[in-house]
Structure formats: structure tokens, C-alpha cells
Amino acid sequence: MGPLKLNTANLSQIVAAGAGRVKVPTYRRGPALKEGIVHVGVGGFHRAHLAVYVDQLMQNHGVTDYAICGVGLQPFDSAMRDALSSQDNLYTVIERSAKGSFANVIGSINSYLFAPDDREAVIAKMAHPDTRIVSLTITESGYYYNENTHELQSEHPDIQFDLDPANEKTPRTTFGFLYAALARRHQQEEWFHHPSHARVFRPSPHPEVAQWITDKGAFPNAMVDRITPQTSPADKESLANTMGIEDSWPVVTEPFMQWVIEDQFSDGRPPFEKVGVQVVKDVHAVEEFEKHKLRLLNGSHSAIGYPGQMAGFNYVHEVLENPDFNKFVWQMMQEEVKPSLPEIPGVDIDQYCKTLMERFSNPTIMDQLPRICLNASGKIPQFIMPSIAEAIWVKGPLRRLCFVAAAWFRYINGVDDQGNTFTVDDPMREELQAKARAGGTKPSELLSITSLFGDDLRNDKRFMQEITNAMEDIARDGILKTLPKYID
């Protein structure tokens, strides 16, 4: 018998064919569930993270009023709409590790709305009384947030479009949809919650709505973590051949999963603690967890991704199989990033770093370097530059961090050390590449983009010397020959 198409009718057969390696939802779905969560951005990470936690609450704790309505805002989200609709909004999460592969069919996404087809339906769903949480998984650029000023990029054409009262019913951005729903809730004088930053609504064309959001909205900070590579055709084929499931768009991920969230909700929340979520009262605790994750995990991903792709590697684990890269990443974490991080009660930073290296080295999830390198202009200012800034402030070591920044500056040109071209997928690609061409092996042109780097870095002689040296060495000798200079 061939693989079974994933849908509600086939679940019992899928379990039988899975020989103990496949779990499926046994709770009632559809009208039996109340959709208390609207989630914008149903990609791989959401389906491997929040949707899994909610599925566990439904499966193991009888929660029925926080099913998820997924929302796609962009034209490319039609692919997810079609995949989910063809299989009753079910999908498979494949966990891979050295111990083997296990599959969980997830049923927590109960419906899906595609905004380009019906924007009003999305606004109405967000504003519906059953909706108690609106959550987001969007890229860094989708936040329209300036890391240097810590404000909304209010001059961006998309934001300007959404600020025009004439366009309230046809928003372009996530925040335009949220504002339209909040304004409707304001009219109804009902409470509303969404996890974002209240400050992004301050440019509102209706001050009374902005004040209502400030008074009655809740905006919990959160830290999320689970490595989730892009799904490949080989992943689909493997699922069909080994577990007998034909899934249009499964998710491959690691066993590790973490979520730390501030306990600040205006209209109730699910009992997240029951499924391992760390719910904390202190917003500063969340911020400290987030700083650890951004600078150690994401910063190390940057140290693997840009130099690794320039050196000709394809996957994260392949980079760390190189002894020089392995030492470099570990030493950068220990000597240049860790000293800037706050201590968190109950968290052993050294053990956290060791766990990260183990996770990065997992060969079974085949984590692609292009995924790591995507949208770097929204990542480097968060993942690498803050550690550099703090090292400058305390006169600490920073040469490895400068090597990573220099590798990205070379990466921007779209040519690796072997002369092979690749696509630089970044919303600022044209400006970045123009600056990179103008600057050559000097960093000044790229560092003049103050929206990414601010004004201070160019004035620090030590930083400028370190990054210039790294850029010149990489240009002359390539990544692999330069790397040993940065290892003790």
C-alpha cells in the first residue's frame, strides 16, 4: 500500500501504518473548537512552535477555546493556504535527532484566511469576540522597526499607506491589519490583546484609539527558540516512504523547543505552563532570555552562515564539522559574547553554549545556510552589532565579531570564495550592494548606513582597524585561509 494522503478521514490508518512513530490528534476539531488565537505568518517556525504547544494543550489537557486561525498577508502565502486546505488544515511535524525520526500530526490550526482574497475577513476575525490573542511570526523587515532609534519606520511607504485613514479597510502591513481590528474593537468597547510593542501604534490617525490601545491592550514580551529548516522535496519523500504519510508541506525540526513569555494578557490565556512554557511575571527576565538567545544562538548562526556560505558549505552541520570553524564559533561565544550577557538564575551559560553547539551539529535536520543568511540587514544589527558595541564600551575583545561582520560585508557582493554567484535575499539588497561595490575592502561605505549601524561605530579606531583588517584578509586569502588567524 502506498502513502496515505493526510486528512481527517485517514488519521486512524496513518497511526496504524506508523508503527508507533506517528501521533495524531484525537480531539474533535472544526466547529467543536473555539478559535481564540489568530496567528499572522503561518510558516515553518509557527507550525513547529506555537501551534505545537497549542496542539499539546488540546490533546493532553482538554483545552478547546484557543484553536488557531492562521492568516497569510502576502501573495506568496497562497501556497500555504492551498497546502493546508487540501488536508483539512492538518500537517506533520517531523522531529529528527541522533535517536531517530518521529512524526506528530498537528491539528491546532482550525482554519486559514488569505488576506489578498478578503482583507475584511481578516480584520473581522481579529476583531471577533472569540479572538483573545493575535500572535505574529514575521521577518525582521516586516516589523518596520529601526534598531537604532527604537521606533517604527513611520516614513516607510507601506506605513504611510496604512496611516492614511482612506486606506483603513485595505491595509498593507501587519500593523495596519492590527490597527483596523483594534479600532473596530474600540468601537465595540471590548478588550483586545496582541503580542507586539504598543509604541508602533502611536502614530495612529485617531489619538483616542491609540490611547485606548495603551490603556486596555496587553503586549507581553517573549523569547522563542526552535531550529526549523526549510522543508525540502526530500523531506516530503522521506515522510511518505518511512512513515506512510503524503503531506503537501510537512515541517522538519529538532527535539529542542523553548518559549519564555511575560504573563501579561488582557483577556485571559491558555494554561501554557502545562506544556512546558516558561511564563514569567518580570518583563526583564524575558528580555534577559531574549538577549541570551539573540546574541548566542542567532549571533552564532551568523558566524556560521555568512562565512560558511562564502567558504562553499551548504549546511550548518557541515560548517561545524570543520575544526577551525568549530573552534571559532565556540571561542566567539565564550570570549566575546558571553561577557556582555546578564546572569539568569538557574541558567548555566556554559552549558547553554554547549547545547547550542550540539544543536548546530545535528546532521539529521539539514539546516540550510541560505535560510540562516536570509534578510541579514534585519539580523546583523540585532545579532552581532550589540555585542560589538558592548565590547567597545568595556574595551573587551571583538576581533571574531568583526570577522563575522566583515564576512557579511563580503557576502553582500553575492560571490563566494570559489567565484560562484548566489542570490542575496535581502530587502536592502540594492543599497547594500551599491555600498559594497563603492567601498571595496574598506567598511566605511557600508557603515555609513546609519539606519543599520548608527553613527558611533565609525568613530572607534579599534573597531575600524579590526573590521578593515578582516575585510582585507578575506578579500585576499578567502575565508578558510583567514579563519586560523582568529583562533587561539
Swiss-Prot record:
Keyword terms, alphabetized: NAD, Oxidoreductase
Range of residues in the leader sequence: none
Annotated Pfam families: Mannitol_dh (PF01232), Mannitol_dh_C (PF08125)
Sample GO molecular function, one term: mannitol 2-dehydrogenase activity
Record family assignment: Belongs to the mannitol dehydrogenase family.
Chain's role: Catalyzes the NAD(H)-dependent interconversion of D-fructose and D-mannitol in the mannitol metabolic pathway.
Entry-linked PANTHER family: MANNITOL DEHYDROGENASE 2-RELATED, MANNITOL DEHYDROGENASE DSF1-RELATED
Designated name of the protein: Mannitol 2-dehydrogenase
Taxonomic path: Eukaryota, Fungi, Dikarya, Ascomycota, Pezizomycotina
